Regions:
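Redox-cofactor-proximal catalytic regions of oxidoreductases
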Residues: 80-170, 212, 404-421, 425
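A conserved FAD-binding loop/helix module that cradles the flavin
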Residues: 539-553
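Short FAD-binding loop at a beta-strand-to-alpha-helix junction that anchors the flavin cofactor
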Residues: 524-536
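Mid-to-C-terminal "cap/lid" subdomains and adjacent gly/pro-rich loops that border
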Residues: 214, 273-277, 281-406, 417, ...
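N-terminal glycine-rich phosphate/pyrophosphate-binding loop and immediately adjacent elements
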Residues: 11-132, 138, 243, 293-300, ...
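Conserved redox-cofactor binding core of oxidoreductases
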Residues: 116, 129, 134-238, 244, ...
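Glycine-rich loop(s) and the adjacent beta-strand/alpha-helix scaffold that form part
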Residues: 60, 66-71, 136, 226-235, ...
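FAD-binding beta-loop-beta segment adjacent to the flavin cofactor pocket
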Residues: 405-413, 509-527
């Protein structure tokens, strides 16, 4: 009896570790050689719903370089936000990288991608964008409602977030749009992918809609390169991939012969251009310098990298405040978005014996606001050590932050090594374009007004003027690392000194330059890129969750009993299912439409799976 119970518990633990999905396996279980209709590289925010949809009719392989998000409290629980980002271990779901600008950043290394790490903000695309895309508004709204039953929730608006809302209205960011998932100028309360119990719902949860017999997901399976063939082909054609399992053994996955079989890269703004280069698609000289055989000289791979700058001001509070991520946003007409996050110890679980400081941790780099070039590991270690001796009361308060739309400044990405697990070298050139700096200054001025407003007076010390708050933020995480004494007098200096990321980096495989309007890689066949690397800039469909990666579609499903979603009201005629993952580090929006394709509302990119 005891043996049977132990076996049952072991089985249940294993199954729930996979989210209850029988098709998720460790890479060590993969056959040495296998064949599929579609091979999706990256089981992130874009890859998961794409795979779930395609699996209704085709055989799909998903290769995820990271592990499972299920049963990981640092991912699941809102109260632990920041812990995963602070985890710098090799098995962490977050992989830290530092741009050549010196800004600390992170990329997902887990099934579900950025939705397993982000602050969870959820939004719909605006109705003007839907109209411009040419979608059937009724079907789109019907689909939004369906999705929102699964991943979108109304956050509880407590005292600190209520004060932020009232302050935004007091300083004139109007009208008040209440709780809405739409993108509207003014002040609003948005949705969240955290439910009422503070549990995260990621894009990996959308695998529940997959056809179990049509999909295979391997974890800890980084792809080394895409394989190409030219035999009997007018130009290079993707034929499969080589991936490595957790024990270091190589496996070969090939496309089945057929007109529709494809390799689809969904590895994100860093991973996708990196993988193209490692596979021989990129600037010829750069590839040759790394002894990579050139399949196609494509000088624009890795170009046009952008990251939306974020700047924040920490406001210590004389009274306890709730733990909250982004809930209230002020959408302005000048190109900046005002938001806030709060909480004692900022997400650090109070039951933990050790203190990793959650969102406050210098390991994250978000609020380690030394100028980028001074954010050395030695400085961060010194800050962490100093913070350990501070009382918990020192961490009570919140951040008012601003993020600029766009941005206009651009950089580039290059390989460091031939190892796909290593971070490439990326430069974003923050504030290189004067327009970005001007937007930042305007945003900081609005933050000052919010902090000085009557509505926010209960949550700030009256004896601390704005100049002191700016200097506190500019000088240190929790006042420990000194810097420019004049930061409060020069907002331009403050913007430059305290620039951070909000994880909305994008570019590297732009539409019209690296991929065509159908997201097919130009110059080769049977290969697409579908993620934020295709974006020229982040569309402002949401005040804080600007689109970083998009776009997921499925094929027209002929003669298939349904369109891939349980209990959905399908049409009798031929159904087209279009899944649009309008996602950044902080959004998940899925749209079902009657048009074959998806479109980025701002850029006007449409993709058709033909």
């Amino acid at each position: 009896m005891a043996t049977g119970l132990s076996a049952l518990l072991l089985c249940l633990g294993f199954c729930f570790g996979r989210g209850g999905f029988p098709f998720i396996h460790q890479s060590t279980a993969a056959p040495m050689v296998s064949y599929y209709d579609y091979i999706i590289v990256g089981g992130g925010t874009a890859g998961c719903p794409l795979a779930a949809t395609l699996s209704q009719t085709y055989s799909v392989l998903v290769l995820e370089r990271g592990g499972s998000p299920f049963r990981n409290p640092n991912i699941t629980h809102l109260s632990r936000f920041g812990a995963a980002l602070s985890d710098l271990s090799p098995k962490s779901p977050s992989q830290r990288f530092v741009s050549e600008d010196g800004v600390i950043n992170a990329r997902a290394r887990v099934l579900g991608g950025g939705t397993s790490l982000n602050a969870g903000f959820y939004t719909r695309a605006g109705s003007p964008y839907i109209a411009k895309a040419g979608w059937d508004a009724k079907l789109v709204n019907e689909s939004y409602r369906w999705v929102e039953k699964v991943v979108a929730f109304q956050p509880p608006l407590r005292q600190w977030q209520s004060a932020v809302r009232n302050s935004l209205l007091e300083i004139g960011i109007r009208p008040y749009n209440g709780y809405t998932l739409d993108h509207l100028y003014g002040t609003k309360v948005g949705g969240t992918i955290f439910d009422g119990y503070g549990r995260r719902h990621t894009s990996a949860h959308l695998l529940r809609y997959a056809n179990p017999s049509g999909i295979t997901v391997f974890l800890h399976a980084p792809v080394q390169k895409i394989l190409f063939t030219t035999e009997g082909k007018p130009r290079p054609t993707a034929d499969g991939v080589i991936f490595t399992d957790a024990s270091g053994l190589n496996h070969w996955a090939y496309l089945r012969r057929g007109p529709n079989s494809e390799v689809i890269v969904c590895s994100g703004a860093l991973g996708s251009p990196q993988l193209l280069m490692l596979s021989g698609l990129g600037p010829k000289r750069h590839l040759q310098a790394h002894n990579i055989s050139v399949v196609l000289d494509q000088p624009l791979v890795g170009q046009g990298m952008s990251d939306n700058p974020m700047n924040a001001v920490f406001v210590p509070s004389p009274r306890p405040v709730e733990v909250s991520l982004i809930q209230v946003v002020g959408i302005t007409h000048n190109g900046s978005y005002i938001e806030g996050a709060s909480g004692e110890n900022f997400g650090t679980d109070q039951t933990q014996s050790t203190r990793d400081f959650g969102m406050f941790s210098p390991k994250i780099g978000q609020f380690s606001t030394l100028p980028p070039k001074q954010r050395t590991q030695k400085a961060l270690d010194r800050a962490i050590q100093a913070m350990r001796f501070l009382p918990r009361s020192a961490f009570v308060g919140g951040f008012i932050l601003e993020k600029i739309m766009g941005p206009l400044s651009r950089g580039h990405l290059q390989l460091r090594t031939k190892n796909p697990n290593d971070n490439p070298a990326v430069t974003f050139n923050y504030f290189k374009d004067r327009g970005d700096l001007e937007r930042c200054v305007q945003g900081i001025k609005m933050i000052e007004k919010v902090i000085e407003s009557r509505s926010f007076s209960r949550f700030r010390y009256n004896y601390l003027p704005i100049s002191s708050l700016l200097n506190m933020t500019a000088n240190a995480p929790v006042n420990m690392l000194p810097k420019h004494a004049n930061a409060s007098r020069s907002l331009e200096q403050f913007c430059r000194d305290t620039v951070m990321t909000i994880w909305h980096y994008h570019g590297g495989c732009h539409v019209g330059k690296v991929v065509d309007r159908d997201y097919k890689v130009i110059g080769v066949d049977a290969l697409r890129v579908i993620d934020g690397s295709t974006f020229d800039y982040s569309p402002g469909t949401n005040p804080q969750a600007t689109v970083k990666l998009s776009s997921i579609t499925s094929r027209r499903i002929k003669g298939h009993p349904g369109n891939g979603f349980p209990n959905d009201q399908r049409k009798k005629d031929d159904t087209v299912l279009a899944l649009l993952a309008v996602v950044t580090e902080e959004i998940l929006v899925i749209v079902k439409g009657s048009i074959v394709g998806v479109e980025c509302p701002i850029i006007g990119l449409k993709m058709k799976m033909t």
